[in-house]
Amino acid sequence: MSRTGTKPKTDWDVIIIGAGPAGMCAANELADRGIGVLVIDRGRDIKERHCPMEEAGKCAQCKQCDIMCGVGGAGTFSDGTLNLRPDIGGDLAAITGDNPTAWALVDYVDGLFLKYGAPERLYTADGAQVEKLKRSAASVGVHFIEIPQRHMGSDNAPRIIENFENDLKSRGTVFRLNAQVRDLLIEDNTCTGVLLEHGEKLSSRFTLLCPGRIGGEWVNTLVKRHGMDAKHGAIDIGVRVEVPSIIMDHITKINHDPKFHIRTKRYDDFVRTFCTNEHGFVVKERYEGFIGTNGHSLKSRRSDNTNFAFLVRTELTEPLEDTTRYGKSVSKLATTIGGGNPILQRMGDLRRGQRSTWSRIRRNPVKNTLEDVTPGDISMAMPHRIVMDIIEGLEKLNEVIPGVASDSTLLYAPEVKFYAMELQVSQELATSTKGLYAAGDGTGLSRDIINAAATGVIAGRAILQQLEKGS
């Protein structure tokens, strides 16, 4: 399968763009087989990834955000929760064609994380407790989704990723980091390699496109430039909610990262909880041209608060179908209103139509874990419909979790989950361009660690099969 003689450094069997879970799991399928595999990532090695905001308390405006880029992907410094279901964070069954295959992929990926050091403990709820919570939620029109989960923790995940990376290297995989791919080399609708930022060309028999969430906009550019088959998907826009942990402890004991789905009354919009960080910390994320928020939970350090994302699903039709462009516009306005920082507002102030001030924040019973913020008015930065969905959704959730929508609850904006244009792919994740495969969040095929990793496995196996055929 590999070419005879000395392989030039510019010539590879497979080039994988992105060293997140999709890229690493694809590389795992190709390792130990005499295949020349190069993994390229714009970020740094896992040992070098570090956010200075942890010490300084403020975003250092790094040229390359270590939270978003580098080996392990953006999920490395999230709360590290692995949702072990094929229908959460994606729709694996739609890709594989059946549920048993999708579940088998989830189990396989879970086994990989265990192999490299993920905790053995699996968070599964007591059946009676789950039924009670489901009944309580259903009685007020809220849907609670039970999920088996494995929690790595934001501080433990890097060790697991490092073990994974070292194993891949020992089995022949080459990593090229701090290298940005500018374009794909495509001739006659066939991908023959990549063009790096400074003009260097690398050739390959097969290329896997999996640049992660931060690469979503770049993927959109590729779609337009090369006429690839793709469609715009939805986008999730909302806030990061922070409450005293005691309010949610009884819920997180049932499910570590509880998923609640809500339909708002006024607009019939879909709102959901996402990425709950028990005793965690709110963090700032830096994108190109705007900022966002996220949440971390550490195994070595705990706060008195629990935070979670509260997101409104937004879909667009003509004349503006580009949800990424829309989400960026909302995020840029919020960044402008916040003076370059996330906006922080008390729930009570938002309800009463008044901006929060530092004096109100300082005397608030709930103390903000992210200090690099600007107290303000979220309704000045977000569309009215989304603001009303957030208020109405939290008040409905309050009927299931009393206190979650109290006046002292803290809201950080914006929290936006960007999904790239969804590339149209085959069951093997081959794109409409010959020799080019796609996987992960950056290509619109997943929305979490497990599903991203699973799509990487699918693509890696498909590429291996083609190489074995001699394609």
Locate predicted features:
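Low-complexity, intrinsically disordered basic tails/loops
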Residues: 80, 116-117
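Residues forming the flavin
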Residues: 2-90, 94, 127-471
